[in-house]
């Protein structure tokens, strides 16, 4: 995967900016908190129905950890375009990263209820994000994200 990823500078920059987006939005801490809450709920439900408490906790933790996952990915993608623009990258090239990703990782084309949006959803969203950022730049403004986190 790394060879195609590093085909041009924007691919590596996209991944890096995306991960910075997760960090800036505190997604790791949120996932840990969600997993802990899920584990507690799983434990209580497991005890209530007579299931193995450890298995119930594991199931609850997994469900908790993946809650909001697609929202987190969308937030990180959104912020990544701002990070790229502020870093001087040509953001118009960013959406095509997901086209290449779909070719190299075909099972990413469909989200299938997973933890990440499909590559086609990402491509479309990124085009919207690029337009939003470019509109700010065209007005002579410093790009500033216009969103509120999905949960506070």
Where is each model-derived feature located?
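Catalytic Zn2+-binding segment of zinc metalloproteases
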Residues: 2-10, 20-37
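Short amphipathic alpha-helical segments at helix-loop
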Residues: 4-5, 61-65, 111
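Alpha-helical structural elements of signaling/regulatory helical domains
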Residues: 7, 29, 51, 86-89, ...
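Envelope-exposed proteins and targeting segments
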Residues: 8-13, 72
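Catalytic-site beta-strand/loop segments enriched in glycine and acidic/polar residues
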Residues: 14-24, 53-66
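C-terminal capping/extension segments of zinc metalloprotease domains
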Residues: 24, 68-152
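Post-HEXXH active-site segment of zinc metalloproteases
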Residues: 28-58, 95-98
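A short glycine-/small-residue-rich loop at the edge of a beta-strand within enzyme catalytic domains
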Residues: 31-32, 63, 67-71
């Amino acid at each position: 995967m790394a060879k195609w990823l590093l085909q041009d500078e924007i691919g590596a920059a996209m991944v890096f900016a995306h991960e910075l987006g997760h960090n800036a939005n505190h997604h790791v801490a949120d996932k840990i908190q969600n997993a802990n809450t899920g584990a507690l709920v799983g434990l209580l439900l497991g005890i209530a129905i007579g299931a193995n408490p450890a298995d119930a906790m594991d199931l609850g933790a997994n469900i908790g950890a993946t809650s909001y996952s697609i929202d987190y990915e969308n937030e990180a993608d959104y912020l990544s375009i701002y990070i790229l623009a502020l870093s001087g990258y040509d953001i118009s090239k960013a959406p095509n990263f997901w086209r290449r990703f779909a070719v190299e990782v075909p099972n990413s084309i469909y989200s299938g209820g997973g933890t990440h949006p499909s590559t086609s959803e990402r491509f479309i969203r990124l085009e919207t994000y690029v337009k939003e950022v470019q509109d700010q730049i065209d007005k002579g403004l410093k790009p500033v994200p216009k969103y509120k986190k999905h949960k506070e």
